[in-house]
Amino acid sequence: MKINTKSKKVNKAWFNDHIHDTYVKLAHKEGYRSRAAYKIKEIDETCGLIRPGQVVVDLGAVPGAWSQYVRRRFAPREAGVGGAAAGELNGRIIALDLLPFEPLEGVAFLQGDFCEEAVLAQLVGLLDGRAVDVVLSDMAPNLSGVEVTDAARIANLVELALEFAQSHLKPQGALVCKVFHGSGYSQLVDQFKRTFRVVKAVKPKASRDRSAETFLVGIGLKSTGMPNADAV
């Protein structure tokens, strides 16, 4: 069988980059499940989103680094390796993903497809009538490499997150959503501007330079007839 040497070189280069990555090392040291924790950390520090006592929904939660970060914001830190959160949580975290989720104390997890109405109904049930302060979406589709197809898949997930946010966020609540630069990006920004009073695009330092991902942050739901959102 012929071996694709180019593919082997790419995989080896990725592995080398990964094991020497500053954020990978930091995540291991601080007890996070992935380097993605530092993406939401920077977004939170930039925008001031997450505070004790809130209700936070984490969409596309696996492996759980974002939920871990929120949990640490909701609980005291014990002295020890990684500064892991300990004690009773002051807040509610609900995580959802298609894939299995390693249990995390204080985090309610629902496994299922956010695109399915039955799963969405279960998620709403877990809220138990409480409005949401922050919706986090790190959801991403399986990419085909066909730009038009991928743009449509990305847009669909963003639109679903927007619909959920519009229905369940508090008036001053916030949505953080992963998007990708390319076809359809400007339309997604426009949708955020129509929905939120303040819209920010944040590319965290922990997001790899070669990655097209960025994060749209919408803060404060608009009422009909309000002027266009401020954008940064």
From Swiss-Prot:
Keywords: Cytoplasm, Methyltransferase, rRNA processing, S-adenosyl-L-methionine, Transferase
Annotated source species: Leptothrix cholodnii (strain ATCC 51168 / LMG 8142 / SP-6) (Leptothrix discophora (strain SP-6))
Cellular component aspect of the GO annotation: cytoplasm
Source species, domain of life: Bacteria
EC number(s) from the headed UniProt entry: 2.1.1.166
Keyword match Cytoplasm: yes
Gene: rlmE
Entry annotated with the keyword rRNA processing: yes
Catalytic activity: uridine(2552) in 23S rRNA + S-adenosyl-L-methionine = 2'-O-methyluridine(2552) in 23S rRNA + S-adenosyl-L-homocysteine + H(+)
Database matches in SUPFAM superfamilies: S-adenosyl-L-methionine-dependent methyltransferases
Family as reported in the entry's similarity comment: Belongs to the class I-like SAM-binding methyltransferase superfamily. RNA methyltransferase RlmE family.
Location in or out of the cell: Cytoplasm
Active-site residues, record numbering mapped to chain: K178 (proton acceptor)
UniProt-listed HAMAP family: RNA_methyltr_E (MF_01547)
Group of enzyme by EC: transferase
GO molecular function (one): rRNA (uridine-2'-O-)-methyltransferase activity
Residues involved in S-adenosyl-L-methionine binding: G64, W66, D97, D113, D138
Protein known as: Ribosomal RNA large subunit methyltransferase E
Function: Specifically methylates the uridine in position 2552 of 23S rRNA at the 2'-O position of the ribose in the fully assembled 50S ribosomal subunit.
